[in-house]
Every structure is written in C-alpha cells, then in structure tokens.
C-alpha cells in the first residue's frame, strides 16, 4: 500500500492552516507555529497520523467494508465523488441531510423511491404520463439523485466515514459517533477534533491538498480489497507460479 510523504504534503500545501484569529485551541498539539498570522500545521505529526489512517482504511477494504466519503463544500465536492467511484465506495457531496445515518430507515424509503423512478424512466412509464406529470417526476428523480445518488447502492450503514473538513461536516460526524461508526477526518486549525477517531491535521480548503487526501484514501481502500481478492485466490489455489 502506498504511503504519503512529507514532500507530497508540502507540495500540496497541507501545512497551511487558517488565520491565527480563527483557531480552535483544541488543535494546539498539531500546530508548528504561525507565519504572517497564518497557522502552520506540524507535518511531522500529520504524516504518520495520515499513514496510520490509510493503513486502517486498507484493513476496512480487506474486510469488504463500506466507506462513505463525505465532503459537501464546493472545493471538495467533485473530488469526493471521484474518489468514491474510483474505489467502488459511496459518497455524499451535495448536502448532508440530517438523519442520513441515524434515521436510515427513512432514507432507505427515499432511495427506493429514487430507484423506482429510475426504472419508470427506462421502461416507458414516464412516456405514458402527461407532460406535466412526467416533468414533475423527472425533477423529483433528479433531486433525489443529487442528495442520495452516492449512497443508493450502499445497502445499509457504512463501516467508516472519510470526511473532508470536520467543522463543515460536524452533523455527519455526530451521527457517526452516535452509531459507533469510526470517523476519519481532515481537521484544519479552525476545527474541533472531538469525535474524530482518526485525525488528519491539515489544510481543508486547498484543492490540491483535498485531492491528495482523497486519492490516497481511495487507493488504500482499493489496495485492501485487492489484498482480500489475492488472499482468497491463494486459498483456493488460483495463484499462478512465477
């Protein structure tokens, strides 16, 4: 499994925190100092903490666990979706609907509605409706897809959350905490690390930094899944001799 080096992090700007006046004192242990009134994150802590998180994600992947990638702010939205799709996992990248985890029974009903609409749009049902009815259903389907498209095939609660910006996604983190679902999160100098099981102290705004976290996390999950496939093949005697 690939690890992330300090050089990778420096190039992506992971070490740049927020302005000092916006800091959260709970992040003090992870701050190296300040430059031009901007906090500098101590990468000597971030590097091992992130690599430990990646090792744990690989472990979850090897057990066929489900990882939900969460990042709803504009800078993270597209990268979150890509990371989830690339690792065959799940995502929320538009808006976190309250109760997405803690009220999953209701969410499941909405997912069923979305899937019903998808079938109807393909099997000719929409064509039999009046233009107005068809338009209304199409709009409903698009709205549901935007909110739930990334979790429609999750089939139950995830085994872990990977979050970009602990502050912005505090509701998702709280719901995961209530259900005992482990949380991996990028926590900037203005955020509260409470409730995060695997803290990744780092810049949560720079697109290059966000892509670094997400690509590495997706690769870790994939490598874990591949290990599992290799182990099964070996057990069944399918491994080719070199």
Swiss-Prot record:
GO molecular function, one term: structural constituent of ribosome
PROSITE patterns membership: RIBOSOMAL_S2_1 (PS00962), RIBOSOMAL_S2_2 (PS00963)
Keywords attached to this entry: Ribonucleoprotein, Ribosomal protein
Taxonomic superkingdom: Bacteria
A GO BP annotation: translation
Keyword Ribosomal protein: yes
Database matches in Gene3D superfamilies: Glucose-6-phosphate isomerase like protein, domain 1 (3.40.50.10490), Helix hairpin bin (1.10.287.610)
An annotated GO cellular component: cytosolic small ribosomal subunit
NCBIfam families assigned: rpsB_bact
PANTHER family: 30S RIBOSOMAL PROTEIN S2 PROKARYOTIC AND ORGANELLAR (PTHR12534), SMALL RIBOSOMAL SUBUNIT PROTEIN US2M (PTHR12534:SF0)
Family: Belongs to the universal ribosomal protein uS2 family.
Protein's UniProt name: Small ribosomal subunit protein uS2
Organism: Aliivibrio fischeri (strain ATCC 700601 / ES114)
Gene encoding the protein: rpsB
